Amino acid sequence: MARIASVNIPDNKRLVVSLTYIYGLGTTMAKTICKKAKILEDKKVKDLTDQELISLRNIIENEYKVEGDLRREVTLNIKKKKDIRSYQGLRHIRKLPVRGQNTHSNARTRKGKAVAIAGKKKAVK
């Protein structure tokens, strides 16, 4: 397995697909990285030479924020919004959807498991 940005990427997959295993790289960005490195997108990772792997590593590490750096930046941005008490920060604090989604009937993944309301006991006739 090749190791890029401290992530083991699978050998038996195409380069574009295996680059998406890195947090912060999608298919579009993986294709642009392949073009910059002048490597065919359809090439399997196991067929890459050491020089090609080194060029991929250099491009990813020097030009893009991936993995730990990106995760850290995202969490700091969320923390900053919470600290300045912006609307989005308040939604994060309350664990509600941040970007204007409806919460009346949806948002179960964000709000957590539904808590049943204890109903009144029916009187026995």
Swiss-Prot record:
GO cellular component, one term: small ribosomal subunit
Gene designation: rpsM
Subunit: Part of the 30S ribosomal subunit. Forms a loose heterodimer with protein S19. Forms two bridges to the 50S subunit in the 70S ribosome.
Family membership noted in the UniProt record: Belongs to the universal ribosomal protein uS13 family.
Protein name per UniProt: Small ribosomal subunit protein uS13
Function of the protein: Located at the top of the head of the 30S subunit, it contacts several helices of the 16S rRNA. In the 70S ribosome it contacts the 23S rRNA (bridge B1a) and protein L5 of the 50S subunit (bridge B1b), connecting the 2 subunits; these bridges are implicated in subunit movement. Contacts the tRNAs in the A and P-sites.
Biological processes per GO annotation: translation
GO molecular function: rRNA binding; structural constituent of ribosome; tRNA binding
SUPFAM superfamilies: S13-like H2TH domain
Keywords assigned by UniProt, alphabetized: Ribonucleoprotein, Ribosomal protein, RNA-binding, rRNA-binding, tRNA-binding
